[in-house]
Amino acid sequence: MNKQQATFDDFFSECYLKYKEYIKNYIAIRICHPHEAEDLAQDVFVRLWEHRAFVNKDTVWSLLFTIARNIVTDKIRRYYKQE
């Protein structure tokens, strides 16, 4: 593992610990299912990890909420499409 990767790993861990409850609560308010909110919050951090090459450390807060909003929108869209 190179130094840059190790630095991002530390940054990612810090972000997860710092923001996971905010993201989970943001999602839970919008979908009203606490257990599903937990799963979707995990998906937010998976997407952050998948796009780590494009993450700007100064704007990670807004990026996390943008990802969360998009995941919630997708979930709601799929729900109504099934009905």
Residue spans for each PLM region:
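Residues within helix-turn-helix
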Residues: 35
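Sigma70-family region 2
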Residues: 4-5, 32, 45-59, 78-80
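A short, charge-rich alpha-helical start-of-domain segment used by transcription regulators
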Residues: 2-25, 29, 38
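Short alpha-helical functional segments enriched in proximate histidine and acidic residues
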Residues: 26, 30, 47, 71, ...
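Arg/Lys-rich amphipathic alpha helix in sigma70-family domain 2
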Residues: 69-83
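Structural recognition of an alpha-helix C-terminal capping motif at a helix-to-coil junction
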Residues: 39-46, 50, 58-70
